[in-house]
A protein has these predicted regions:
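Catalytic-site neighborhood detector that most strongly recognizes the C-terminal catalytic loop/helix
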Residues: 325, 329-350
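Conserved tyrosine-mediated DNA breakage-rejoining catalytic core shared by Y-recombinases
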Residues: 202-246
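C-terminal secondary-structure termini that scaffold catalytic or DNA-interacting sites
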Residues: 353-365
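Short, charged phosphate-coordinating catalytic segments
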Residues: 119-123, 190-214
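N-terminal core-binding DNA-recognition domain of tyrosine recombinases/integrases
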Residues: 24-39, 48-141, 173
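Active-site/catalytic core of tyrosine-dependent DNA strand-transfer enzymes
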Residues: 241-295
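Short, basic (Lys/Arg/His-rich) helix/loop patches that form interaction surfaces
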Residues: 284-323
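Basic, Lys/Arg- and aromatic-enriched nucleic-acid-binding interface segment
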Residues: 164-197
Length: 365
């Protein structure tokens, strides 16, 4: 990795010669130019470094994989998963081995790199183990869209994953224990907008807020002083409640002398960096302080899950929730929705009450 005026550039070097490995490095640069988030590029760099080390251990190169038959290719990539699962990718003693989902995610990144290689015309054929699949989805107005994907029949079995959420009553307790209005506004906006923490910390008070309509905008910028940025180089917006807007205005008035000295809505209100843009590390430190005071564990991502579940219970369509969260596919949104067994029984009771006569059972008794 190389830093250039706070920008990160990832590239690969040969262990012995120190020469740059061209194609993997070009792939990471392609991701950077495509406005992929730095964290995503970093994960891609690690995934590819693990795979390249695996190839070295097997005394193979990238071109060798294309020469393999189907069964050989399949064994090669499943062996990579087993190698990852055993913690062989790390030089440190792993106290906690990677789960199946993490191992699969590394391999999916490897497959994306192979696809990039093929698009660069380095190979006239594709990997034999990847098959084309199609998924049909509908947007909020019913228009169908066909998604083409590559699938691999060798991934490790994944458990059904549902991310952690937080309940409304716990959010209320956290708000009551906040040390200042900035922290209260930050929690409220996370809960009411569903924005990622990087998106919210990038909000500029003079450009990204419609004070008349009470709308907060997410604008993609890759030069924010605090390193915050929107994930998918996208533009989104969210309306906040009148009550939250009132607290927002109270916060701006309360700290206006600090806020007007720079561009960002959220700033450090005390300490050595007072008046400087608030960073993600500061948010997590604030949440840890609240956890010590209340015993309630919270994270920005848990508040995104709360947003999604609260809207689902209020009757929002899945497509609308997905768009509000900035997801590129519905599958990701579905993982946010914590549907309980009690809810399933409740909606089943309501269904049968509306449709008791659907099978004509009364006539059978």
């Amino acid at each position: 990795m190389q830093m250039d005026k706070q920008e990160k550039f990832y590239f690969f070097r040969e262990n012995e010669s120190g020469d740059i490995v061209y194609l993997p490095s070009k792939y990471l640069m392609h991701k950077k130019r495509s406005k992929i988030s730095p964290n995503t590029i970093r994960r891609s760099a690690f995934a590819l470094s693990y795979y390249l080390n695996f190839l070295d251990e097997k005394q193979l190169c990238l071109d060798d994989i294309y020469q393999m038959k189907y069964i050989e290719q399949h064994e090669h990539f499943t062996d990579f998963l087993i190698w990852l699962k055993a913690g062989m990718h790390s030089r440190e003693d792993y106290l906690k081995l990677p789960n199946n989902e993490t191992c699969n995610a590394y391999l999916k990144e490897v497959f994306r790199f192979y696809t990039f290689m093929e698009q660069e015309n380095k190979h006239s054929e594709s990997l034999k183990v990847l098959s084309d699949t199609q998924m049909i989805v509908r947007n909020s107005i019913g228009i169908r869209k066909v998604l083409n994907r590559k699938s691999f029949r060798g991934y490790l079995k994944e458990k059904g994953h549902q991310g952690k959420t937080i309940e409304q009553d716990k959010i209320v307790v956290l708000l009551q224990e906040c040390a200042n209005s900035r922290d209260q506004v930050l929690l409220l906006l996370l809960a009411e907008t569903g924005f990622r923490i990087g998106e919210l910390l990038g909000v500029r008070y003079a450009e990204d807020i419609d004070y008349e309509k009470h709308i907060i905008y997410v604008n993609f910028r890759d030069d924010n002083e605090n390193g915050a940025r929107a994930k998918n180089a996208e533009l989104r917006r969210a309306k906040i409640s009148d009550a939250t807007f009132d607290i927002l205005m109270f916060y701006i008035e309360d700290y206006k002398e600090l806020i007007i000295g720079q561009e960002y809505l959220f700033i450090n209100v005390s300490g050595d960096y007072v008046g400087k843009p608030f960073k993600g590390s500061g948010v997590y430190a604030m949440l840890r302080r609240l956890e010590r005071k209340t015993g309630i564990k919270a994270s920005p991502h848990m508040l995104r899950h709360y947003f999604a579940n609260a809207r689902r219970k209020d009757g929002w369509k899945l497509e609308m929730i997905s768009q509000a969260l900035g997801h590129r596919n519905i599958e990701t949104t579905m993982k946010y929705l914590n549907i309980t067994e009690d809810e399933l029984i409740e909606v089943s009771d309501a269904f049968y009450n509306r449709h008791q006569a659907m099978y004509g059972v009364q006539n059978l008794l």
